[in-house]
Amino acid sequence: MATAQLATFKIPPVSNEPMLSYAPGSPERAGLQAALAEMQSQLPFEVPCIINGQEVRTNNIQKQPMPHDHARHLCTFHEGSPELVEKATCGALQAKDGWETMPWNDRAAIFLKAADLASGKYRYKLMAATMLGQGKNTWQAEIDAAAELADFFRFGVSYVEELYAQQPPKNAPGCWNRTEYRPLEGFVLAVSPFNFTAIGGNLPGSPALVGNVVVWKPAPAATYSNYLVFKILSEAGVPPGVIQFIPGGAEIVQAAIQSPNFRSLHFTGSTNVFKSLWKDISSNLDKYKVYPRIVGETGGKNWHVIHKSAEVRNAVLQSVRGAFEYQGQKCSALSRLYVSRSVWENGFKTQYLEEIAKIKVGPCLDWNNYMGPVIGRRAYDNITGFIKKAKEEGGEVLIGGSGDDSKGFFIQPTVILTKVPRSTTMVGEIFGPVVTAYVFEDSDYEKTLELIDTTSIYGLTGAIFASERQALLTATNRSRNAAGNIYYNEKCTGAVVGQQPFGGARGSGTNDKAGSISIFYRFVSARSIKENFVGLEDFHYPSNLV
């Protein structure tokens, strides 16, 4: 029996989750230390597939190693199969009617509760899983697994309330016009990355919030933290079958996009994989019931440009954080550094290298370590391969350049100086703690902006450091399509939900702006309704009369 909604409810005001300091002696540090100790004492965890609310063990066992100690595993997980994907899609479609017809205030309450669970009851457990499994230090885990995840859920509810309130402004006499925002017909496939637990929650969460059903394939290197997010959503009240959790590899994705009921892809990951999936989806158009929607955030080759008028100290420190937080494994991380010669030679170079030399690299369990490991063997080999290539091309390694994979996948923060602005490390996405610097003549500022715009296929983030307003404006205009997020005198990373909607175009994705109302338009199908209160007495129009 349907439940009547007897009032128009207004959600509580939302704000960004406060981030805790984890200072020595603080209760949050003690809580996190306890969670880390407990988790390490229970390794490895077992992660099943979850289909229609039931645990499914396929006995095709894969492992999630800990990148700081790769001989040990955070969890083993049961890898899904194409047959299981078919079962999952059928189950999701069976759950669809009950979920999309659930009153909006009830769906909203579920996600508000999930936010409170993530930022409260399960805060330290989520952080511990993210630190051990994905190699984040305490602060990076805090801003991701605790704060941003909660922000995605809370602000998502606020944005959907705003979306539903968007109604036609005019009504003719005797009529009432209105718009409803239907969930998509079919299911959404969410394919989430390793580098942000919060994105793991947002990719299935955003479509589900507006009434869609979702098949979710987490990244193998983030399986355990994403499993915890799934459990939180279930505890908050997401019904069985609404989100189907299937760990595994590419075959999961391929099986899902073969279904005639596939309706949308919500993806974060590499540009090459996204392009390949787009082609595969396009080749299946004739089998789909509805044209699919493709939403993706992919790679970046992000940049800082330091104008001659820049405040040097701020530019130095922002460029340290932008490049080396989370080992450069953020889609938005600094990779290309363009510095005017007068700034480079009058303090920037010296200070930049001095600050980088202070960075401690090691396991996340040591509170002194600013950088941890890169995510795995493939990443380690790829990053060190880029460094080797840079040396072969004549690049000068100013600091770092070495790695140690004997126990964990550790790479030293690396700065390469190049005289070739289109060298390999200025063009290709490295996704690691490597910055390539190019020094330009002060008089070549506008030429350098053209280089920034034309050097890579990407268009995700960029930052401009200058005290002269005209320098900021010139760079903003000349880089109009080179970045979806631009920062003035601030590092190119760290977009906050509700403050800086995030996403880029070109080779960086569809720029649908996670963390804003924009993303939700992609997962609804609007329907206009016109109700007439006054009947016709004659079908003729006055113009027909003589």
From Swiss-Prot:
Q: What is its EC number?
A: 1.2.1.88
Query: Which keywords does UniProt give here?
Result: Cytoplasm, NAD, Oxidoreductase, Proline metabolism
**Enzyme kind, highest EC tier:** oxidoreductase
Name the principal localization, coarsely classed: cytoplasm
Q: Where is this site: Transition state stabilizer?
A: N195
Q: Name one Pfam family in it.
A: Aldedh
What compartments host this protein?
Cytoplasm
Q: Which residues form the active site?
A: E297 (proton acceptor), C331 (nucleophile)
User: Which superkingdom heads the taxonomic lineage of this protein's source?
Assistant: Eukaryota
- Record's catalysed reaction(s): L-glutamate 5-semialdehyde + NAD(+) + H2O = L-glutamate + NADH + 2 H(+)
What InterPro entries does this protein's entry cite? Ald_DH/histidinol_DH, Ald_DH_C, Ald_DH_CS_CYS, Ald_DH_N, Aldehyde_DH_dom, P5CDH/ALDH4A1, Proline_metab_enzyme
Q: Cellular component GO terms, alphabetically? A: mitochondrial matrix
A GO molecular-function annotation: 1-pyrroline-5-carboxylate dehydrogenase activity
Q: Where does NAD(+) bind?
A: K279, D280, I281, S282, S283, N284
Keyword Cytoplasm part of the UniProt annotation = yes
* GO process terms (BP): proline catabolic process to glutamate
PROSITE patterns for the chain: ALDEHYDE_DEHYDR_CYS (PS00070)
**Hey, which family's this protein in?**
Belongs to the aldehyde dehydrogenase family.
Name this protein carries in UniProt: Delta-1-pyrroline-5-carboxylate dehydrogenase
Question: What is the species of this protein?
Answer: Agaricus bisporus (White button mushroom)
Source organism lineage? Eukaryota, Fungi, Dikarya, Basidiomycota, Agaricomycotina
